[in-house]
Amino acid sequence: MDFPAAQPKPAADGKIIYYPPGVKETTDKITNDEVVKRLKMVVKTFMDMDQDSEDEKQQYLPLALHLASEFFLRNPNKDVRLLVACCLADIFRIYAPEAPYTSHDKLKDIFLFITRQLKGLEDTKSPQFNRYFYLLENLAWVKSYNICFELEDCNEIFIQLFRTLFSVINNSHNQKVQMHMLDLMSSIIMEGDGVTQELLDSILINLIPAHKNLNKQAFDLAKVLLKRTVQTIEPCIANFFNQVLVLGKSSVSDLSEHVFDLILELFAIDPHLLLSVMPQLEFKLKSNDGEERLAVVRLLAKLFGSKDSDLATQNRPLWQCFLGRFNDIHVPVRLESVKFASHCLMNHPDLAKDLTEYLKVRSHDPEEAIRHDVIVTIITAGKRDLSLVNDQLLGFVRERTLDKRWRVRKEAMMGLAQLYKKYCLHAEAGKDAAEKVSWIKDKLLHIYYQNSIDDKLLVEKIFAQYLVPHNLETEERMKCLYYLYASLDPNAVKALNEMWKCQNMLRSHVRELLDLHKQPTSEANSAAMFGKLMTIAKNLPDPGKAQDFVKKFNQVLGDDEKLRSQLELLISPTCSCKQADVCVREIARKLANPKQPTNPFLEMVKFLLERIAPVHIDSEAISALVKLMNKSIEGTADDEEEGVSPDTAIRAGLELLKVLSFTHPTSFHSAETYESLLQCLRMEDDKVAEAAIQIFRNTGHKIETDLPQIRSTLIPILHQKAKRGTPHQAKQAVHCIHAIFSNKEVQLAQIFEPLSRSLNADVPEQLITPLVSLGHISMLAPDQFASPMKSVVANFVVKDLLMNDRSTGEKNGKLWSPDEEVSPEVLAKVQAIKLLVRWLLGMKNNQSKSANSTLRLLSAMLVSEGDLTEQKRISKSDMSRLRLAAGSAIMKLAQEPCYHEIITPEQFQLCALVINDECYQVRQIFAQKLHKALVKLLLPLEYMAIFALCAKDPVKERRAHARQCLLKNISIRREYIKQNPMANEKLLSLLPEYVVPYMIHLLAHDPDFTKPQDVDQLRDVKECLWFMLEVLMTKNENNSHAFMKKMAENIKLTRDAQSPDEPKANEKLYTVCDVALCVINSKSALCNADSPKDPVLPTKFFTQPEKDFSNDRNYISEETRVLLLTGKPKPTGVLDTVNKPLSATGRRPYIRTTGSETGSNISVNSELSSSAGNRSREQSSDISETGVSENDENPVRIISVTPAKTEPVKNKEINSDQATQGNSTERGKKRTATASGTENIHQKAEENNADETGPSLAAKTRRGRPPKPEPQGTTAKNEETNKPPVRGRKRAAASQESPGSLEAGNAKAPKQQDTAKKPAAAQRQIDLQR
């Protein structure tokens, strides 16, 4: 390039400065504008020069040095500085690789100067931006800053440069600017000897969240820079984290407090940046500082959980160490670990297996928040994709639906409901996913069995929003309900039925409240209204607060007539679902307060409205259900598609309609609905027909007047069902006729007369339905049929049917058989007993001899163990059925006050002893019937005392069930007394504490209690007393402990009304009183206070105290008292009281059994336990008897001395259907040794063992309990006594008489002498070895 001759100017140091042609000398003497003008020409000159122009380079060297003078570097004018910087950049380019500046200080000043000029890059709209860009481009291209490596303090320049570039980068810069910046910085990092901490900080600071949010472009620039220089910068990063994490030198950097944020960002940029850091994190996970562990867990949770992370597979030791933090002692650490699991499950399904076990443990964490978050974690992942959560994880959520904390239960229930709606209702992931969560509907409805009102309300809400969404169109909603009901398990169906029943009950309470508003104000009206408000409040969450809100709502109702009319419409039987929705919104709008965003009063009212509003069922809905069922009958429905067979759909549909007929009867009243039901009546399925009759019975009150065509078709069908249908159909048909027809007398007579004439005991299979029909007819229309029935009862039922055994039962030793195996004759006899009861219940007359005769007959049935004729023709299982029927019959009659009066104490005791029957099913079913009647307050209080005898039950589950029954009954009675203030005389029949005298009297007459001073017998008495007293003494309400003590003391001042002049009877009574006093005194320190009132004793059981009679005697010795209280166990394996021979009437013997001993009847875990301690809640190791069937006739005892671990017994009720099903279970399969022919169900399996038993296992005397071994030489002597005892015969001279009539059944049997002797020690040794 040719330059014109330059104009030389003398420099300050004497050297001549050559300026480019046309450029005058640039000094501080000229203006800034002139300086700029001249510098622009200089810039142009240097810009055009290249490195090869040696002459020019030499010529302009002084100028280059001059431009680095203080005048230019410190010039206040930014344009001057920019132009100088551009010149200097070009000078470095031209003179590269050597700079013309030899002074290190000057070089440092120059580069700091250039760096400062780079700040001008910030404003892209500046007219000078292109020059700034040129400056950056030039520096980056030439790598000018690499010159600084020679400087000692080059780091200061680099730090300033990096900070400048990161501060100026912004979103208005194009890609070229960013690339030049990257080139500039990366060359410094990669070509230097290392990166100092300060320089590293200048990069890393841009990754901190606060800075990252302020300048996203700086973050991106740092990210790309780190990626580009990863190999060079990684050791520097590792050193930094090592200093901070391992050595704890937080002072090395201002970023020390942000290390975990930095690790997270660096890992996202490139995991290789942290190759050396990860092991340091494993070290930190084990820190003693909980907060430090928490910070590391938070960090690693993000690292492991991020979507593209493969850290868990790349670094297994760190992953395993991290999983260990799920079990950290520090609660926040465990909480953080659980929260992480959700992201991990969603982003890394392959790690679910590793997480499952840890989540299982945390689902039982003592901290509520952690259990809650486990649920949230699993449900969140499940809602994203069901395949992300395995069955085990869903199982954890299922468990938590029963958590002790409401927040956790609610989360679990709502989570499962959402999954069900998504995958079952909407089928978003196909049939397999729907099948995977199909159990949810059952589980959620099962929760309705919980006692908490919050649980019940949430189940109702879930049902209305998730299981059968109420906002669906009617047809869709009913289809959803129809197939849901068909696919529910039996317990879920019961829960759903109970839910509708509770809602209907609450509707009726609100209806009654509105009726009270219509009545004139009075004191009685106010009291009734208050009681009704308290009842309504109990059906709402937090009953305490609810009472105040309900009272307030009641005031509003009283003042606002329009609101009352809206509420009346809402609960009226004709209210449609759409109307209900409008009413609820209207009432809520009226009660809303705009000034009060959170209104607890309104929330409570909404709860009430949601419970009573008919959001699912109305006339249109019932019509839609019936159409669906018709389609199932015709075979045109989608039954198979919905996973239900047509038969199941039809049966379930009818059952559903039957339940709804109780709660919404008005909605059924249409010809179309009834036509469909008539079609069901003609179907072969007995259950379907039975349900259809029930629906007619519940809903058909207007059929006669409004639908004559339906009436004329229905009558002959009902007649046919009453005569020849199944027993259940017959019962429903008779009740249906009585309920819906005005000429019921004529209709019933047309059934009664032909049936009563055609009774034939020789064909028992044809007797059952007629006996059912006749019994219900005589109960429903006693005035018309009581007299004609009397002759049927006397001539046929008693004389011909009950007093004769026409067939011989199967002698297989079973104590129970399934329903289908029971002989028709016994089924007929059971129905005959029920007929007697129904006939008497209809008459309600205790003046006639019929009631007494029937009670004597039933007593005779119990005394004779079910074999009324005592001809030994009836089988053991049939005898069990008849004993159960007789005991249940007495209990049923006792529910009618007029018959309760004439039931003698002896008959009551016989009835009570059924709960100690040798047959498991008899005990089970009788206890359920007893509880059902007591809980409805139908039975007198004395019958609750029967549960005390359950302490003797050999099966733990039965004891547990009895205890639950007691808890329920006592709480119901106490609640009833609170809600219904009453006079003292009524308290006698309701106050639970008044059960004590009945219990004492019952135990004093226990046939097992023969020797008042026998310690083992007294221990049994004590166990029975404590079984009841423990529940009664849970709380000392109104000084009840002292009251019970006073009752026991007062009994000692009376005599036994049953046998007032018999010293032994009175001694036994007083002894039981002393045992009761002993127990009460030992268990309560509060019983020594004075009783607030003097208890009244029942005169039926105790005489009036005599004025001059005092009874200070102690009937149990101090030694005995100590033995009873210390609970010294009886000798292992020997239960003297249980094993003694039969000693009184009405007692069926049985043995203490283990879980395998209920004899193939039912699967129950139970152990033989000593009588010490509370048998309902044994916690100790029990001696386990194996190889005995409780229901075997002649069981053989094989005693194990290994302590058996007790299993917790769930307190559940088992209904009679389950009892029969239980016979098919696999309990007690093969026994080590057993008597031939004694196995209750698995007889064939046992026959192979019969030959192994040998002569020593000959048939024993007693069913159900092993006899005591006798000394040698007594075998012949006892051949007679080894025969089964004949029970119920009269004493001595009268022993040959046969009970041929009702009167004979009233005879008492003598107490037999205890002929069995105690086992010898040697014999016991043999038993144990066996």
UniProtKB/Swiss-Prot annotation:
<comment type="subunit">
    <text>Interacts with the cohesin complex. Binds chromatin in a cohesin-dependent manner.</text>
</comment>
<dbReference type="Pfam" id="PF20168">
    <property type="entry name" value="PDS5"/>
</dbReference>
<dbReference type="InterPro" id="IPR039776">
    <property type="entry name" value="Pds5"/>
</dbReference>
<comment type="similarity">
    <text>Belongs to the PDS5 family.</text>
</comment>
<feature type="compositionally biased region" description="Low complexity">
    <location>
        <begin position="1160"/>
        <end position="1171"/>
    </location>
</feature>
<comment type="function">
    <text>May regulate sister chromatid cohesion during mitosis and couple it to DNA replication.</text>
</comment>
<feature type="region of interest" description="Disordered">
    <location>
        <begin position="1138"/>
        <end position="1330"/>
    </location>
</feature>
<dbReference type="InterPro" id="IPR011989">
    <property type="entry name" value="ARM-like"/>
</dbReference>
<keyword id="KW-0498">Mitosis</keyword>
<keyword id="KW-0131">Cell cycle</keyword>
<dbReference type="GO" id="GO:0000785">
    <property type="term" value="C:chromatin"/>
</dbReference>
<dbReference type="GO" id="GO:0005634">
    <property type="term" value="C:nucleus"/>
</dbReference>
<dbReference type="GO" id="GO:0051301">
    <property type="term" value="P:cell division"/>
</dbReference>
<keyword id="KW-0132">Cell division</keyword>
<protein>
    <recommendedName>
        <fullName>Sister chromatid cohesion protein PDS5 homolog A</fullName>
    </recommendedName>
</protein>
<keyword id="KW-0677">Repeat</keyword>
<dbReference type="InterPro" id="IPR016024">
    <property type="entry name" value="ARM-type_fold"/>
</dbReference>
<feature type="repeat" description="HEAT">
    <location>
        <begin position="387"/>
        <end position="423"/>
    </location>
</feature>
<feature type="compositionally biased region" description="Polar residues">
    <location>
        <begin position="1216"/>
        <end position="1225"/>
    </location>
</feature>
<dbReference type="GO" id="GO:0007064">
    <property type="term" value="P:mitotic sister chromatid cohesion"/>
</dbReference>
<dbReference type="GO" id="GO:0006281">
    <property type="term" value="P:DNA repair"/>
</dbReference>
<dbReference type="GO" id="GO:0008156">
    <property type="term" value="P:negative regulation of DNA replication"/>
</dbReference>
<keyword id="KW-0539">Nucleus</keyword>
